[in-house]
């Protein structure tokens, strides 16, 4: 087993693979049980009066828990180390993830899902922080992007696996949450605790004010981006039903196309970023997602909805990598996990808040579902304004760089 504290080891593909697979556990937590919600509702409807309202929270509860617990997860990782907290997160993930197999009370299942979200917060915070700890800036960018791609691929895979595993009983997919136990030996043997003191002695000094600004900008961008992204994820089925599309296969196919477009965007991100810079990519991704929302709200037919999925998904593929990279470049090692924890909290807070925000906007516009299209259009307009602001930032940075070259 590697030493607990290692200042000389060099991270490579093996460490990258372990971290990427561990990161993908966070998406598995939600997508694997989504196909089971109708069966769970049917079982508990007879004994739980609020089943129709509570069952959907089985998907939303982990996101809320991550949003609330991720900052504390960052503090724990900075205080006690990334590797110990990652191991703890994997063990708790398996424990609380599989707990619903033996629980017969819906409210206790929701409690288990909240605790499960806390485990996810530990895993996501530690994995992202380790990428920044192990690799220098250029390689850091590459592994952050691979992390996003792996999460997308594994999420799509387990969406199908969860549906197949639940054909007999809705409880069966929860047994798959024990799989992270197989990763524990790899984490123990192939990952090590980075020597943050040595890194600090060689790090460039970034003014605290600049670090705080970068953190605030990253958190704002990921929150707005995730709200926009999840408008499509959550509201597309309702829009399709309003357009007369009720086939679950067609609705699922639209979600699959969005995932595929997101993967394409993630793969294209390094090339696009090299061409137009971070600010330019921020403007592009927000503009793509805003256009996707507009097309979705105005779509008269299923094929046009698919166009919206492509636009939104492509922009979403840039989001996490482009929002997190500037932050990971400036966070000092002793505060890195706390910064990543705050970023992770805003990411999942955006997911949780998205349907609430759209519902609130729709209320004075005719309520749900009649005011849904207008609410989506209004949020698209706000997103486009943020995109224009980033475009101005990019143009200003370009002029400043041109001036420096001339002088």
Residue ranges of model-derived segments:
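Extracellular/periplasmic helix-loop-helix junction of adjacent transmembrane segments
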Residues: 37-67
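Central cavity-lining transmembrane alpha-helices of secondary-active solute carriers
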Residues: 57-73, 256-268
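Conserved MFS/SLC helix-loop-helix module at the cytosolic interface between two early adjacent transmembrane helices
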Residues: 67-106
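Helix-to-loop junctions at the C-terminal end of transmembrane segments
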Residues: 68-81, 265-278, 362
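Cytoplasmic helix-loop-helix junction between adjacent transmembrane helices
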Residues: 106, 112-151
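Helix-loop-helix hairpin linking two adjacent transmembrane segments in secondary transporters
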Residues: 137-138, 146-192
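Symmetry-related core transmembrane helices of the 12-TM Major Facilitator Superfamily/SLC fold
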Residues: 173-189, 373-392
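Extracytoplasmic gate region of multi-pass secondary transporters
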Residues: 214-256
């Amino acid at each position: 087993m590697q030493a607990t504290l290692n200042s000389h080891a060099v991270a490579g593909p093996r460490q990258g693979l372990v971290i990427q697979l561990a990161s993908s556990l966070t998406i598995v937590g939600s997508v694997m049980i989504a196909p089971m919600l109708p069966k769970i509702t049917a079982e508990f409807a007879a004994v739980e009066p609020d089943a129709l309202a509570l069952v959907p929270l089985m998907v939303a509860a982990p996101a809320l828990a991550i949003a609330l617990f991720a900052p504390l997860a960052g503090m724990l990782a900075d205080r006690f180390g990334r590797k110990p907290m990652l191991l703890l997160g994997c063990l708790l993930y398996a424990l609380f993830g599989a707990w619903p197999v033996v629980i017969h009370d819906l409210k206790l299942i929701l409690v288990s899902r909240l605790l499960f979200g806390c485990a996810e917060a530990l895993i996501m915070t530690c994995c992202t922080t380790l990428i920044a700890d192990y690799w220098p800036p250029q390689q850091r960018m590459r592994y952050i992007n691979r992390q996003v791609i792996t999460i997308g691929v594994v999420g799509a895979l387990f969406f199908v696996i969860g549906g197949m595993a639940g054909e007999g009983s809705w409880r069966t997919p929860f047994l798959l949450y024990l799989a992270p136990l197989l990763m524990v030996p790899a984490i123990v043997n192939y990952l090590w605790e980075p020597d943050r003191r040595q890194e600090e002695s060689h790090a460039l000094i970034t003014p605290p004010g600049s670090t705080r600004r970068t953190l605030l900008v990253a958190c704002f961008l990921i929150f707005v981006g995730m709200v926009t992204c999840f408008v499509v994820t959550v509201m597309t089925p309702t829009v399709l039903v309003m357009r007369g599309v009720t086939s679950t296969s067609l609705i699922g196919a639209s979600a699959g196309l969005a995932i595929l477009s997101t993967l394409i965007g993630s793969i294209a991100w390094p090339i696009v970023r090299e061409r137009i810079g971070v600010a330019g990519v921020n403007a592009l991704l927000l503009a793509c997602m805003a256009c996707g929302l507009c097309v979705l709200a105005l779509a008269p037919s299923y094929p046009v909805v698919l166009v919206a999925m492509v636009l939104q998904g492509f922009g979403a593929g840039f989001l996490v990598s482009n929002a997190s990279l500037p932050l990971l470049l400036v966070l000092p090692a002793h505060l890195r996990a706390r910064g990543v924890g705050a970023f992770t909290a805003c990411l999942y807070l955006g997911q949780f808040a998205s349907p609430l925000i759209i519902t609130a906007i729709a209320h004075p516009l005719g309520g749900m579902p009649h005011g849904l299209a207008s609410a989506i259009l209004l949020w698209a307009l706000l997103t486009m304004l943020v995109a224009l602001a980033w475009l101005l930032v990019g143009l200003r940075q370009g002029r400043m760089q041109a001036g420096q070259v001339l002088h």
